[in-house]
């Protein structure tokens, strides 16, 4: 993955080029067609996902709670706290996502601590 793709995501925007290069090595691109479920409430949280392009709807217990778009991140809480997913995210248009798996996020603690700290801050803000 190219580091310029990561820089467009606010979570990574202020990261150093060196840290972004470390993330880019193991970041994966993923697509979710319109109408499909990206993550399911109650499911295992195995990846952090950032929206590169497209839109999605977030619901909890069947109730709409938020809309997401380019630059938004989801799945981060379960990555750090080893919790089940707290909401369902459904693509309202084709989603182009950047995915970081659980192992890769944990690896950021050592390889890119500044980015890992930003993820921790995001989790705290959403509690």
Where are these regions (language model features)?
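A small-molecule sensor/coupling module
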Residues: 2, 18-22, 84-85, 102-127
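Short loop/turn positions at the edges of beta-strands in beta-sheet-rich folds
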Residues: 52, 62, 81-83, 91
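Surface loops and adjacent helix of pleckstrin homology
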Residues: 61-63, 70, 79, 100-103, ...
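Helix-loop-beta junctions that constitute the ligand-sensing/allosteric loops
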Residues: 28, 82-88, 94-97
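Regulatory nucleotide-sensing modules
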Residues: 3, 7-61, 68-70
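Short beta-strand His + acidic residue motifs that chelate non-heme Fe in jelly-roll/DSBH
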Residues: 58-59, 76-77, 87-91, 99, ...
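A short hydrophobic beta-strand segment most commonly corresponding to one strand
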Residues: 5, 94-105
């Amino acid at each position: 993955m190219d580091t310029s793709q990561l820089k467009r995501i606010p979570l990574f925007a202020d990261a150093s080029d060196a840290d972004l290069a470390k993330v880019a090595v193991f970041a994966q691109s993923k697509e979710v067609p319109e109408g499909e479920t990206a993550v399911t409430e109650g499911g295992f949280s195995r990846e952090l996902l950032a929206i590169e392009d497209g839109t999605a709807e977030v619901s909890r217990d069947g109730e709409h709670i938020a809309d997401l778009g380019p630059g938004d991140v989801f799945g981060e809480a379960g990555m750090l706290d080893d919790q089940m997913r707290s909401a369902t995210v459904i693509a309202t248009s084709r989603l182009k996502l950047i995915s970081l798996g659980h192992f890769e996020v944990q690896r950021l603690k050592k390889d890119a601590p500044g980015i890992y700290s930003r993820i921790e801050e995001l989790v705290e803000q959403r509690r």
